[in-house]
C-alpha cells in the first residue's frame, strides 16, 4: 500500500511541478 501511495504522491508532484513551471513562464 505504501508503494501505491508513493506512486500517487510522485504523480501528483510531477503534475504540480509542470503546472508551476508553466505559471512561472506565463508570469515572466
From Swiss-Prot:
At the top level of its lineage, which domain of life is listed?
Answer: Bacteria
Q: What is this protein called?
A: 3,4-dihydroxybenzoate decarboxylase
Molecular function via GO: protocatechuate decarboxylase activity
* pH dependence of function: Optimum pH is 7.0. Stable between pH 6.5 and 9.5.
Q: What does this protein do?
A: Reversibly catalyzes the decarboxylation of 3,4-dihydroxybenzoate to catechol. Inactive toward 4-hydroxybenzoate and other benzoate derivatives.
Cite the EC number: 4.1.1.63
Broadest EC class assigned to this enzyme: lyase
Q: Give UniProt keywords alphabetically.
A: Decarboxylase, Lyase
Source organism per entry reads Sedimentibacter hydroxybenzoicus (Clostridium hydroxybenzoicum)
Assembly, per entry: Homopentamer.
- What is this enzyme's catalytic activity, as reactions? 3,4-dihydroxybenzoate + H(+) = catechol + CO2
- Regulation of protein activity: Inhibited by oxygen. Completely inhibited by HgCl(2). Partially inhibited by ZnSO(4), 2,3,4-trihydroxybeonzoate and 3,4,5-trihydroxybeonzoate. Unaffected by KCl, MnCl(2) or EDTA. Not stimulated by thiamine phosphate, pyridoxal 5'-phosphate or biotin. Not inhibited by hydroxylamine, NaBH(4) or avidin.
Temperature sensitivity?
A: Optimum temperature is 50 degrees Celsius. Stable between 11 and 50 degrees Celsius. At 55 degrees Celsius the half life is 1.5 hours.
